């Protein structure tokens, strides 16, 4: 049951990341209170932790790689939206957050 709960939460978190990354910028105003880099890093750190918790036998660094890949894909997709653009800094923030989440999970195992 615990795995199902974390899988549902993970899916919702992914949906929120996709919306926040691809929605028109006007729809996500006010999300930059703590700084864009911190927001990206937190989002992907949380995603990594949630994904690890949703696995029976977690492979932490594979999960980190999947989170980094999602972040890169979303950054690339932003270049196809009207008022968004892909950013290397955002991709680095996503990867940093995923690595922090993975390190936290590895430390807590």
Regions found by a protein language model. Give the residues of each.
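Membrane-helix interface segments
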Residues: 2-8, 56-64, 87-88
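"…centered on the first transmembrane helix and the immediately adjacent amphipathic helix/loop
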Residues: 1-51, 67
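Membrane-embedded catalytic cores of phosphoryl/pyrophosphoryl-handling enzymes
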Residues: 47, 52-80
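Residue-level signature of the transmembrane alpha-helical core
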Residues: 41, 46, 64-72, 91, ...
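Short helix-capping/hinge motifs at transmembrane helix termini and TM-loop junctions
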Residues: 23-24, 55-56, 82, 109
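Interfacial helix-loop-helix junctions of multi-pass membrane proteins
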Residues: 27-37, 74-99
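Membrane-interfacial alpha-helical segments at the cytosolic side of multi-pass membrane proteins
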Residues: 42-60, 98-108
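Alpha-helical transmembrane segments of multipass membrane proteins
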Residues: 15-18, 49-50, 72, 76, ...
